[in-house]
Amino acid sequence: MGMASSHRLFGQLAPSSVMRACSATGRAVAKADRSSALDGGRSQVAALVSRETLARLDTIAEQLTRWQKTINLVAPNTLPDLWHRHIADSLQLVWLVPETVLNWADLGSGGGFPGLVVAAVLAEREGAHVTLVESDTRKAAFLREASRAAALPTRIVPERIEQASQRLAAGMQVVSARALAPLPKLLDLTEPFLQAGALGVFPKGRDWERELTDARKGWTLDLNLHRSVADPYGRILAITRAERAAPSAGSLSGGQPSTAGAASARPRTAKGKTP
Protein backbone atom coordinates (compact mmCIF):
# COMPACT_ATOMS: atom_id res chain seq x y z
CA MET A 1 0.00 0.00 0.00
CA GLY A 2 1.44 3.37 -1.03
CA MET A 3 1.59 6.51 1.04
CA ALA A 4 -1.42 8.14 -0.63
CA SER A 5 -3.63 5.06 -0.35
CA SER A 6 -2.70 4.45 3.27
CA HIS A 7 -3.45 8.09 4.02
CA ARG A 8 -6.88 7.72 2.42
CA LEU A 9 -7.54 4.52 4.36
CA PHE A 10 -6.70 6.23 7.62
CA GLY A 11 -8.96 9.11 6.65
CA GLN A 12 -11.84 6.74 5.92
CA LEU A 13 -11.46 5.05 9.29
CA ALA A 14 -10.71 8.07 11.47
CA PRO A 15 -11.65 9.06 13.98
CA SER A 16 -14.37 6.87 15.50
CA SER A 17 -13.82 3.55 13.78
CA VAL A 18 -10.05 3.72 14.19
CA MET A 19 -10.54 4.51 17.86
CA ARG A 20 -12.85 1.50 18.21
CA ALA A 21 -10.35 -0.72 16.40
CA CYS A 22 -7.49 0.51 18.55
CA SER A 23 -9.54 0.10 21.71
CA ALA A 24 -10.42 -3.45 20.74
CA THR A 25 -6.75 -4.14 20.08
CA GLY A 26 -5.86 -2.73 23.46
CA ARG A 27 -8.41 -4.95 25.23
CA ALA A 28 -7.14 -8.01 23.38
CA VAL A 29 -3.58 -7.13 24.32
CA ALA A 30 -4.41 -7.14 28.01
CA LYS A 31 -5.67 -10.73 27.78
CA ALA A 32 -3.05 -12.20 25.46
CA ASP A 33 0.52 -13.25 25.94
CA ARG A 34 3.30 -11.01 24.69
CA SER A 35 3.86 -12.58 21.27
CA SER A 36 0.21 -12.75 20.26
CA ALA A 37 -0.40 -9.26 21.65
CA LEU A 38 2.36 -7.77 19.55
CA ASP A 39 1.08 -9.61 16.48
CA GLY A 40 -2.47 -8.36 17.06
CA GLY A 41 -1.38 -4.73 17.28
CA ARG A 42 0.89 -5.24 14.31
CA SER A 43 -2.00 -6.46 12.19
CA GLN A 44 -3.93 -3.27 12.86
CA VAL A 45 -0.94 -1.14 11.89
CA ALA A 46 -0.23 -3.31 8.83
CA ALA A 47 -3.54 -2.21 7.30
CA LEU A 48 -2.38 1.40 7.28
CA VAL A 49 1.16 1.30 5.87
CA SER A 50 3.11 -0.11 2.95
CA ARG A 51 4.96 -3.41 3.22
CA GLU A 52 8.25 -1.56 3.18
CA THR A 53 7.21 0.71 6.04
CA LEU A 54 5.90 -2.28 7.99
CA ALA A 55 9.27 -4.01 7.59
CA ARG A 56 11.00 -0.94 9.00
CA LEU A 57 8.56 -0.84 11.92
CA ASP A 58 9.25 -4.53 12.57
CA THR A 59 12.95 -3.75 12.82
CA ILE A 60 12.29 -0.86 15.21
CA ALA A 61 10.15 -3.13 17.41
CA GLU A 62 12.85 -5.82 17.41
CA GLN A 63 15.58 -3.34 18.31
CA LEU A 64 13.53 -1.78 21.09
CA THR A 65 12.67 -5.17 22.59
CA ARG A 66 16.37 -6.10 22.58
CA TRP A 67 17.60 -2.81 24.06
CA GLN A 68 14.80 -2.67 26.62
CA LYS A 69 16.51 -5.51 28.48
CA THR A 70 19.32 -3.17 29.51
CA ILE A 71 17.85 0.35 29.08
CA ASN A 72 14.45 1.56 30.22
CA LEU A 73 13.22 2.91 26.87
CA VAL A 74 9.49 2.56 27.55
CA ALA A 75 7.50 1.73 30.66
CA PRO A 76 7.89 -2.06 31.08
CA ASN A 77 4.15 -2.61 31.50
CA THR A 78 3.52 -1.07 28.06
CA LEU A 79 5.85 -3.40 26.16
CA PRO A 80 3.19 -6.10 25.56
CA ASP A 81 1.07 -3.35 23.98
CA LEU A 82 3.96 -1.95 21.93
CA TRP A 83 2.24 -1.79 18.55
CA HIS A 84 -0.92 -0.14 19.81
CA ARG A 85 0.40 1.97 22.68
CA HIS A 86 3.54 3.30 21.02
CA ILE A 87 3.72 2.57 17.30
CA ALA A 88 0.09 3.32 16.34
CA ASP A 89 0.10 6.29 18.70
CA SER A 90 3.15 7.67 16.87
CA LEU A 91 1.96 6.72 13.40
CA GLN A 92 -1.16 8.87 13.62
CA LEU A 93 0.95 12.04 13.79
CA VAL A 94 2.18 11.51 10.24
CA TRP A 95 -1.35 11.63 8.86
CA LEU A 96 -1.98 15.04 10.41
CA VAL A 97 0.68 16.85 8.38
CA PRO A 98 0.98 17.49 4.62
CA GLU A 99 2.42 14.66 2.54
CA THR A 100 4.99 17.12 1.23
CA VAL A 101 6.75 17.37 4.61
CA LEU A 102 10.41 16.34 4.38
CA ASN A 103 12.09 17.91 7.42
CA TRP A 104 10.85 16.85 10.84
CA ALA A 105 12.39 17.36 14.29
CA ASP A 106 11.46 15.16 17.24
CA LEU A 107 12.55 16.40 20.64
CA GLY A 108 13.34 14.18 23.61
CA SER A 109 13.06 11.13 21.37
CA GLY A 110 13.93 8.63 24.12
CA GLY A 111 12.67 5.23 23.03
CA GLY A 112 12.04 6.46 19.50
CA PHE A 113 8.42 7.52 19.72
CA PRO A 114 7.30 9.20 17.63
CA GLY A 115 10.63 9.96 15.92
CA LEU A 116 11.64 6.51 14.67
CA VAL A 117 8.09 5.72 13.54
CA VAL A 118 7.89 9.02 11.67
CA ALA A 119 11.21 8.23 9.99
CA ALA A 120 9.95 4.78 8.99
CA VAL A 121 7.11 6.43 7.06
CA LEU A 122 9.06 9.38 5.67
CA ALA A 123 11.71 6.98 4.34
CA GLU A 124 9.42 6.59 1.32
CA ARG A 125 9.77 10.30 0.53
CA GLU A 126 12.87 11.24 -1.42
CA GLY A 127 15.00 13.77 0.45
CA ALA A 128 13.27 13.31 3.81
CA HIS A 129 15.20 13.82 7.05
CA VAL A 130 14.06 13.30 10.64
CA THR A 131 16.19 14.88 13.35
CA LEU A 132 16.03 13.15 16.74
CA VAL A 133 17.22 15.17 19.73
CA GLU A 134 18.06 13.09 22.81
CA SER A 135 20.54 14.12 25.51
CA ASP A 136 20.74 10.70 27.22
CA THR A 137 23.78 9.07 25.62
CA ARG A 138 22.50 5.50 26.02
CA LYS A 139 19.15 6.33 24.46
CA ALA A 140 20.90 8.23 21.69
CA ALA A 141 22.97 5.08 21.04
CA PHE A 142 19.76 3.06 20.76
CA LEU A 143 18.26 5.58 18.33
CA ARG A 144 21.42 5.44 16.23
CA GLU A 145 21.49 1.63 16.13
CA ALA A 146 17.76 1.28 15.42
CA SER A 147 18.07 3.84 12.63
CA ARG A 148 20.99 1.94 11.12
CA ALA A 149 19.23 -1.43 11.34
CA ALA A 150 16.04 -0.11 9.74
CA ALA A 151 17.83 2.13 7.22
CA LEU A 152 16.00 5.23 8.43
CA PRO A 153 16.69 8.79 7.20
CA THR A 154 17.54 10.15 10.64
CA ARG A 155 20.09 12.41 12.25
CA ILE A 156 20.74 11.83 15.95
CA VAL A 157 21.61 14.93 17.98
CA PRO A 158 22.86 13.89 21.47
CA GLU A 159 22.40 17.30 23.05
CA ARG A 160 20.03 19.09 25.38
CA ILE A 161 17.07 20.61 23.59
CA GLU A 162 17.86 24.07 24.93
CA GLN A 163 21.33 23.91 23.39
CA ALA A 164 20.33 22.49 20.02
CA SER A 165 17.00 24.13 19.19
CA GLN A 166 18.24 27.48 17.90
CA ARG A 167 20.70 25.76 15.59
CA LEU A 168 18.23 23.18 14.29
CA ALA A 169 15.06 25.25 13.91
CA ALA A 170 15.72 26.79 10.50
CA GLY A 171 14.05 24.84 7.71
CA MET A 172 12.13 22.43 9.94
CA GLN A 173 8.57 21.91 8.76
CA VAL A 174 7.30 19.92 11.75
CA VAL A 175 8.38 19.63 15.37
CA SER A 176 7.03 16.90 17.65
CA ALA A 177 7.46 15.78 21.24
CA ARG A 178 5.71 12.97 23.08
CA ALA A 179 5.53 12.70 26.87
CA LEU A 180 8.28 15.31 27.18
CA ALA A 181 6.78 18.09 29.31
CA PRO A 182 3.53 19.88 30.18
CA LEU A 183 2.39 22.17 27.37
CA PRO A 184 3.61 25.49 28.88
CA LYS A 185 7.14 24.09 29.23
CA LEU A 186 6.87 22.35 25.87
CA LEU A 187 6.12 25.67 24.19
CA ASP A 188 9.24 27.14 25.79
CA LEU A 189 11.33 24.28 24.41
CA THR A 190 9.86 24.34 20.91
CA GLU A 191 9.55 28.12 20.54
CA PRO A 192 12.52 28.44 18.12
CA PHE A 193 10.90 25.89 15.79
CA LEU A 194 7.42 27.40 16.01
CA GLN A 195 8.77 30.90 15.45
CA ALA A 196 10.64 29.63 12.38
CA GLY A 197 7.35 28.41 10.90
CA ALA A 198 7.25 24.73 11.89
CA LEU A 199 3.97 23.02 12.71
CA GLY A 200 3.96 21.71 16.27
CA VAL A 201 2.39 18.27 16.67
CA PHE A 202 2.05 17.24 20.30
CA PRO A 203 0.08 14.22 21.56
CA LYS A 204 -1.40 14.78 25.00
CA GLY A 205 -3.20 12.51 27.47
CA ARG A 206 -6.31 13.01 29.55
CA ASP A 207 -4.95 16.23 31.11
CA TRP A 208 -4.76 17.97 27.74
CA GLU A 209 -7.52 20.46 28.57
CA ARG A 210 -5.87 21.62 31.79
CA GLU A 211 -2.49 21.91 30.06
CA LEU A 212 -4.02 23.97 27.27
CA THR A 213 -5.71 26.29 29.77
CA ASP A 214 -2.42 26.78 31.60
CA ALA A 215 -0.54 27.43 28.37
CA ARG A 216 -2.99 30.08 27.23
CA LYS A 217 -2.17 32.14 30.32
CA GLY A 218 1.18 32.93 28.76
CA TRP A 219 0.72 32.21 25.07
CA THR A 220 -1.54 33.15 22.19
CA LEU A 221 -2.13 29.96 20.21
CA ASP A 222 -3.67 28.98 16.89
CA LEU A 223 -4.24 25.24 16.89
CA ASN A 224 -6.37 22.32 15.81
CA LEU A 225 -7.40 19.52 18.16
CA HIS A 226 -7.53 15.93 16.91
CA ARG A 227 -8.82 12.89 18.76
CA SER A 228 -6.16 10.29 19.47
CA VAL A 229 -6.70 6.89 17.88
CA ALA A 230 -4.68 5.26 20.66
CA ASP A 231 -6.09 7.06 23.70
CA PRO A 232 -9.85 7.78 23.85
CA TYR A 233 -9.21 10.52 26.42
CA GLY A 234 -6.25 12.06 24.63
CA ARG A 235 -5.91 14.75 21.99
CA ILE A 236 -3.25 15.72 19.51
CA LEU A 237 -2.50 19.43 19.45
CA ALA A 238 -1.49 20.71 16.02
CA ILE A 239 -0.16 24.21 16.70
CA THR A 240 0.19 26.52 13.72
CA ARG A 241 1.07 29.69 15.65
CA ALA A 242 2.41 30.37 19.13
CA GLU A 243 3.26 33.83 20.42
CA ARG A 244 4.04 34.84 23.94
CA ALA A 245 1.23 36.88 25.42
CA ALA A 246 2.11 40.51 26.12
CA PRO A 247 2.73 40.94 29.86
CA SER A 248 0.33 43.16 31.76
CA ALA A 249 1.55 46.31 33.49
CA GLY A 250 1.32 44.59 36.86
CA SER A 251 3.29 41.56 35.73
CA LEU A 252 6.15 43.74 34.53
CA SER A 253 6.87 44.64 38.16
CA GLY A 254 6.20 41.19 39.55
CA GLY A 255 2.61 41.99 40.41
CA GLN A 256 3.57 45.00 42.57
CA PRO A 257 2.54 48.56 41.74
CA SER A 258 5.17 50.74 40.12
CA THR A 259 7.42 52.72 42.45
CA ALA A 260 7.18 55.72 40.15
CA GLY A 261 5.51 58.55 42.03
CA ALA A 262 5.59 56.64 45.30
CA ALA A 263 7.41 59.45 47.07
CA SER A 264 4.65 61.90 46.24
CA ALA A 265 2.15 59.61 47.92
CA ARG A 266 4.00 59.63 51.23
CA PRO A 267 3.05 62.10 53.96
CA ARG A 268 5.14 65.27 53.97
CA THR A 269 6.50 67.28 56.86
CA ALA A 270 5.64 70.90 57.44
CA LYS A 271 8.74 71.88 55.44
CA GLY A 272 7.57 69.78 52.48
CA LYS A 273 10.22 67.08 52.91
CA THR A 274 9.39 63.43 52.79
CA PRO A 275 10.31 61.73 56.09
Curated annotation (Swiss-Prot):
UniProt protein name: Ribosomal RNA small subunit methyltransferase G
Organism of derivation: Azorhizobium caulinodans (strain ATCC 43989 / DSM 5975 / JCM 20966 / LMG 6465 / NBRC 14845 / NCIMB 13405 / ORS 571)
Record-annotated disulphide pairs: none
Localization per Swiss-Prot or TrEMBL: Cytoplasm
GO terms under cellular component: cytosol
Pfam families (alphabetical): GidB
Matching InterPro entries: rRNA_ssu_MeTfrase_G, SAM-dependent_MTases_sf
Keyword Ribonucleoprotein assigned: no
Biased composition (Polar residues): 250-261
Keywords, comma-separated and alphabetical: Cytoplasm, Methyltransferase, rRNA processing, S-adenosyl-L-methionine, Transferase
Lineage of source species: Bacteria, Pseudomonadati, Pseudomonadota, Alphaproteobacteria, Hyphomicrobiales
Chain segments carrying region Disordered: 247-275
Xref: PANTHER family: S-ADENOSYL-L-METHIONINE-DEPENDENT METHYLTRANSFERASES SUPERFAMILY PROTEIN
